[in-house]
Design a protein with these regions (language model features):
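Short acidic/polar hinge/loop motifs at secondary-structure boundaries
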Residues: 62, 186-213
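N-terminal periplasmic accessory domains that precede
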Residues: 95-102, 147-150, 165-170, 182, ...
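Outer-membrane beta-barrel translocator/receptor signature
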Residues: 190, 205-207, 218-288, 294-302, ...
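Outer membrane beta-barrel strand-and-loop segments of large Gram-negative receptors
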Residues: 415-429, 574-580, 586, 599-664, ...
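Gram-negative outer-membrane beta-barrel transporters
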Residues: 605-609, 626-724
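C-terminal beta-signal and adjacent terminal beta-strands/loops
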Residues: 609-611, 615, 720-727, 749-813
């Protein structure tokens, strides 16, 4: 596969252009003073190229094909802008034909461009599909411990967490295999069915995150029922630039230290970027339990790309490697409340040791037994090839996820569980010749997966899956209307291999076995999905949106065949081979109002799901928990299905009153309720639905420079997580969670030299400012064993945490 990627890459570079040189040139000024703006970023996502304005506000983008493209224009302190810009032959440009663009001085995000789930770059405000966006600037101002934590505070978004290192996105109450995670528009596949399986993406490499709420995209096939999260890395810098950055950060709670170094450039149509980063964290502390044993992690990552921009289009070969070791807390304590950890007494004897709060500080006990090692490596070749009036987008990728778990204190290097998942993907989209008001595209997605178990134990079988899908998508523009519609067909083929054990638990062939761990089977699933939506721009301030979509999710191997307990979880899971494919029908209604001093977004949805798959706890014949392995007494859960409905919505407002344009008052409210239909009272609520969430933030920013400080800001915010009493209480599957408040604050600025160049960016923040004792309803540690000293169930959320981040821009050329 790697040879194929390289062959295609070098073959494309030999294509010969058949038309003359085209370019894009323009000038950007302040909308009030009409002064030229220096350092404005102009980026065309469909071409993976852009430019930055010079001291006269001018910019030039060379080596582009003929056509009109949607550009995103951004500068800190100004409203971003989506602008359609057209290329012309080099000889056609002069001072009178330059593009004239003005930016409004405000930090509000008015018209960002999105590229996720649509056939081409689209202005977010006009897209009928509900979306959310998080930028690098926002992530720098709001600290988190992992990539998913950076989006969990957005309206309608939550996360399932297991400590500080492991988090999984939840969109409007749905997560796991119902959320497709992308890295630069290509699926990230890493055994995402597991509670303690996080997202293998380096937080430092993220430039922005785009989110689709619901099955509104037909571009990605099975599993996108809840939506899509697309982690986008920085795009190539402007032609002629060479630079980079050095970033570092420290958090006081747990001692998390991270750093990253990046170098990039773009010369003569060849762009490149290389990044290396690392993180190290010890045990974190909570207000009620002090330091929590075995909650540290360490991480070493690398990524980069090399790209080629020519008249025929763009080709980019990217790579990434993610390497993480995570300690898995078990929460066992003695009668005095001290945490217990397993220790090795001699070669044949294991014991336990109680650790005081002082002993748990630092890093010495942060990576004990049990722990995970995760390696995720991927290479992707992305191509955008332009013809005279059409283009072809082709992505080829290969990735491998190695997930190993260690739980034997007498043999700490013994891999009790080892899963190697290899995924190959092909995504192709052909964009037909478009008119001024319409665009048609069609595409195919192919994916092959192979899972191989190499450890002492297996909780899912060895298997192979093959996915194939085809879709067509249409967009129509009118003066005030925007229409979009699409249809898709998918098939998934599954080949699951059997595993048989003899009386000693050793693998045997089918003729000598005494126990069937996994039985062999073959299955296939076929489904159809579609989307239709419209937006209506009543005036320059107000837009209405309506969208109807049908989603599809084939059962995963965990649901069909799991059989075992995972380290870091508190349950034993068994699969169900009779599971059917889930299908859903969702309707979304929304409106957006934007003005110079007030922004408002309101979204509502209703989602009906057939054959909804969920876990439920099993009771034994004696009425208590069913226990599969008395030596490791975890309760047994199994997968069942039923029809379900989810409904709710989000409200977001941003007030920045005149003449206090430097002040922003942001508020948001998110609500979702999930119901299982035709069930008894204790089983009517969908399990593990996030509670209603209210967030409020006041943000003040300096409009002018203060000595050597530029873009200085101060913010303070509060989040209210309401009580979640609507739980799936049957068999003790889920417990209620009380309400709580969390407060945060932050400040920072860019430090400039005498020439006005930014030499250092500084960001301070404080999370859980009041040191509140709380449990997140979606925390898996909530179900850890109770503390014998006070009877409190589970482990609690991180206490007060101060953070500092430093970013040093490097400008070589």
């Amino acid at each position: 596969m790697k040879k194929i990627l390289l062959l295609i890459f070098f073959s494309i570079t030999q294509l010969v252009a058949l038309h003359s040189q085209y370019s894009i040139r323009g000038r950007i000024t302040d909308s009030e003073s009409h002064e030229p703006l220096y350092g404005v970023s102009i980026f065309i996502a469909d071409l993976k190229t852009g430019a930055a304005t010079d001291t006269n506000g001018n910019f030039t983008i060379n080596n582009v094909p003929q056509g009109t493209f949607l550009a995103e224009i951004r500068m800190i302190g100004y409203a971003s802008k989506a602008e359609p810009i057209s290329s012309k032959p080099n000889s056609a440009w002069n001072d009178s034909t330059l593009l004239r663009i003005e930016l409004l001085k405000t930090p509000a995000e008015y018209h960002p461009v999105i590229i996720t789930g649509v056939s081409g770059s689209t202005e977010r405000m006009r897209n009928p599909v509900p979306t959310a966006l998080n930028t690098k600037e926002h992530m720098l101002k709001h600290s988190s411990t992992n990539a998913v934590g950076a989006i969990a505070e957005l309206p309608g978004i939550s996360m399932v967490s297991t400590g500080n290192a492991i988090s999984k996105p939840v969109i409007r109450g749905l997560g796991y295999n119902r959320v497709v995670v992308l890295r630069n528009n290509v699926r990230q596949e890493g055994q995402q069915w597991g509670d303690e399986h996080g997202i293998e993406i380096d937080e430092y490499e993220i430039d922005r995150i785009e989110i689709i709420k619901g099955p509104g995209s037909i571009m990605y096939g099975s599993d996108a029922m809840a939506g899509v999260v697309n982690f986008l890395t920085p795009q190539p810098v402007a032609e002629g630039k060479i630079g980079g950055e050095i970033a570092t950060g420290y958090q006081t709670n747990g001692g998390l230290f991270g750093s990253s170094i990046m170098q990039e450039g773009h010369l003569h149509g060849i762009s490149w970027q290389v990044r290396m980063s690392q993180k190290l964290a010890g045990n974190y502390s909570t207000p009620i339990d002090g330091y929590i044993a075995n909650t540290g992690f360490k991480e070493y990552n690398g990524s980069g790309f090399i790209g080629l921009n020519r008249k025929w289009g763009v080709s980019q070969l990217s790579f990434s490697t993610f390497n993480q070791t995570i300690a898995l807390p078990e929460g066992e304590r003695d009668s005095t409340g001290m945490f217990l950890i397993p220790i090795r007494i001699n070669d044949t004897t294991a014991g336990i040791q109680a650790l005081s709060n002082d002993e748990l500080k630092g890093y010495d006990y942060s990576l004990g037994i049990p722990f995970q090692k995760i390696g995720h490596h991927r290479a992707v070749l992305s191509n955008n090839i332009f013809f005279r009036n059409s283009r072809l987008k082709l992505d080829l990728g290969i990735q491998q996820n190695n997930r190993r778990e260690y739980g034997n204190v007498l043999a700490p290097e013994e891999e009790e569980l080892s899963m190697k998942l290899t995924t190959s993907t092909l995504n192709a989209v052909y964009f037909f010749p478009e008119t001024k008001t319409a665009q048609l595209s069609a595409g195919v997605n192919l994916q092959h997966q192979s899972n191989l178990n190499e450890g002492e134990e297996s909780i899912i079988p060895d298997y192979q899956t093959n996915d194939a899908g085809a879709f067509v998508f249409f967009r129509k523009y009118a003066t005030k209307w925007f229409f979009s519609a699409g249809a898709r067909s998918d098939i998934r083929l599954i080949n699951s291999e059997g595993l048989y054990l003899d009386s000693t638990g050793i693998t045997a062939d089918s003729s000598a076995y005494t126990t069937t761990k996994f039985s062999a089977f073959n299955k296939y699933f076929v489904s159809y999905s579609g989307v239709a939506g419209a937006s209506y721009q009543m005036n320059k301030h107000l837009v209405w949106r309506l969208n109807l979509s049908r989603g599809f999710r084939a059962p995963n191997m965990s649901g069909l065949s799991s059989n075992g307990k995972h380290e870091g979880t508190f349950r034993y899971e068994t699969g169900n081979k009779s599971l059917k494919a889930e299908t859903s029908l969702q309707v979304d209604l929304g409106t957006t109002y934007t003005s110079d001093h007030f922004n408002l977004e309101i979204s509502a949805f209703y989602n009906s799901i057939q054959n909804f798959t969920y876990l439920t706890k099993l009771n034994s014949t004696f009425g208590g928990d069913s226990i599969a392995d008395p030596s490791d007494p975890a309760p047994v859960y199994t997968f069942v299905q039923g029809n379900a409905a989810l409904f709710g919505g989000e409200i977001y407002s941003d007030i920045h009153p005149h003449p206090l344009d430097w002040l922003h008052f942001e508020n948001s409210l998110s609500y979702v309720q999930g119901l299982l239909l035709n069930q008894p009272d204790s089983m009517t609520n969908l399990p593990f639905i996030p509670p209603m969430k209210y967030q409020s933030e006041i943000n003040a920013h300096a409009e002018k420079e203060i000595g050597p400080l530029k873009n200085a800001y101060f913010m303070i915010g509060a989040s209210r997580f309401f009580a979640q009493n609507k739980v799936y209480s049957a068999f003790g599957t889920e417990t209620a969670t009380p309400a709580y408040w969390l407060m945060e604050a932050g400040t920072g600025a860019d430090i400039i030299n005498k020439k006005g160049t930014v030499v250092l960016r500084v960001f301070f923040s404080a999370n859980n400012l009041l040191n509140t004792t709380y449990q997140s309803h979606l925390s898996r540690l909530k179900y850890a064993p109770a503390n014998p000293l006070n009877g409190r169930q589970g482990l609690y959320g991180q206490g007060r945490n101060f953070s500092i981040r430093l970013v040093i821009p490097v400008n070589i050329k």
